[in-house]
Amino acid sequence: QRDLLNPNSLGAPAFNIELLAQHDVHWSAGDIAEIQPENSTARIHAFLKQHQLDANTILADGQQTLVQALADKDLTAPIQTFKTADELLAQLSPLPSREYSIASIPSQQVLRLVVRQKFDAQGELGLGSGWLTAHAALGQNIALRIRNNPSFHLIDDDRPIICIGNGTGLAGLMSLLHARTRLNYTQNWLFFGERQQAHDYFYQHTIEAWQSTGMLQRLDLAFSRDQAEKVYVHHKLREQAEELKRWIEQNAVIYVCGSIQGMASDVDQALKDILGETQLEQLRQQGRYRRDVY
């Protein structure tokens, strides 16, 4: 399943991607999905045309055609002279994998990702985001593996948690909050930032339902383009400095997920200013300041 999360947004399109496992797959809240992308059909056929190759050429193993074998190969590398399709393939490396924070927990029976489209200098869709949001057909198999991410795992008790994120970083926080609500742990606080509330409030209905049922005790939203002066997540943190200190005194654990440039560094500085560098470092060493940033 593939749904646009931000119609008419000022930012690039962001999608809710839902994948169904073909066999038992286990992950924990906070884990990462490593996706093996494939080339678009158009990209493969352009490559075949450029090198005057027949898509239906059978390879030496007799199992695959050339067009099938090129699906997960890096087609951007320079090519040396070759005599056969197999000699060509020997020159091509596999496409690199792409990592995404998982937004769901196994009991939901779906592996959910939040993927924003990225574009290169030529205006072409990025490798991972293009594959997941545009090129892969609905119902097509997606190759992935789960990467254990213990440094961002959920604590196994009912201490308060403070979740801080922006944009697609909400994904990793949603998995934590889904897990907490299943356990009926209610001391949860979410800070979320995006551009405009009308267009970029990802998973609004779920978040507001948690709030109305008491599963989300506090919610602070920062929509930067909804007022003349831009407001970001770190501004909201500073506004709530005294309440934040109270939660930390109650042994709260801080989780930060999202862009390392801008949000995560600004949040880190705000936390240093509010709590002091010494206390923030103590929280880090105690496993009470956890980050999944990219």
Language model regions located:
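FNR-like FAD-binding dehydrogenase module
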Residues: 1-294
